[in-house]
């Protein structure tokens, strides 16, 4: 009944290395896309939000500045959390902001 034992020395190490490299590349690509998407969203929205973020409360609340607002009464404190860029998850609408 020795046939049930496995000999792990016959496993090809090249296939394990190749699998690890593929997984690492996929995870790195996802992280890079998330970071670049978040940075692009900040720069895109920041140019529309300079007057509101400074603290001019008389202006329309969160008109184009949803990522920088709490949507309560205080527009000076930033909202916490990380927004998922829309090009990574195109089918899900997880963001609170309205599309332009």
Swiss-Prot record:
What InterPro entries does this protein map onto? InfluenzaB_glycoprotein_NB
Q: Which domain of life is it from?
A: Viruses
Please tell me whether the keyword Translocase is annotated for this protein.
no
Listed transmembrane segments: 19-40
Q: Which residues are glycosylated?
A: 3, 7
Q: How does it sit in the membrane?
A: Single-pass type III membrane protein
UniProt key word Ion transport: yes
Keywords associated with the record: Glycoprotein, Hydrogen ion transport, Ion channel, Ion transport, Membrane, Signal-anchor, Transmembrane, Transmembrane helix, Transport, Viral ion channel, Virion
Q: Which family does it belong to?
A: Belongs to the influenza viruses type B glycoprotein NB family.
What's this protein's name? Glycoprotein NB
Compartments, as annotated in UniProt: Virion membrane
Q: How does it assemble?
A: Dimer.
Q: Ranges in the Virion surface compartment?
A: 1-18
Q: Which GO terms describe its molecular function?
A: channel activity
């Amino acid at each position: 009944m020795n046939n049930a034992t496995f000999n792990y020395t016959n496993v090809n190490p090249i296939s394990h290395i190749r699998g690890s490299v593929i997984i690492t590349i996929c995870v790195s690509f996802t992280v890079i896309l998330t970071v670049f998407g978040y940075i692009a969203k900040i720069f895109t929205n920041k140019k529309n939000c300079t007057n509101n973020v400074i603290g001019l409360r008389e202006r329309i609340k969160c008109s184009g500045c949803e990522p920088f607002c709490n949507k309560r009464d205080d527009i000076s404190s930033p909202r916490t959390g990380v927004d998922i860029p829309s090009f990574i998850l195109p089918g899900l609408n997880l963001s609170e902001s309205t599309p332009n």
